[in-house]
């Protein structure tokens, strides 16, 4: 017999948003997903040589854990 209450809540109609605009509905464990990029605005698919200006991994980590980069 399977264990009860060990699985996350499943949302059948999860909204996928890009820049605040709804893109589609999917199934997920989150009620809403915010994405930065998708095929309609990705430089590879739009044939543009635009530099993607997004936070680097280190900066994102430091911001997430509220750390100061100048700390030694």
Curated annotation (Swiss-Prot):
One of its GO terms (biological process) is translation. The keyword Chaperone does not apply. One of its GO terms (cellular component) is ribosome. InterPro entries: Ribosomal_bL28/bL31-like_sf, Ribosomal_bL31, Ribosomal_bL31_sf. Pfam families: Ribosomal_L31 (PF01197). Gene3D superfamilies: Ribosomal protein L31. Its main location: plastid. Keywords: Chloroplast, Plastid, Ribonucleoprotein, Ribosomal protein, RNA-binding, rRNA-binding. Binds the 23S rRNA. Belongs to the bacterial ribosomal protein bL31 family. Type A subfamily. This is Large ribosomal subunit protein bL31c.
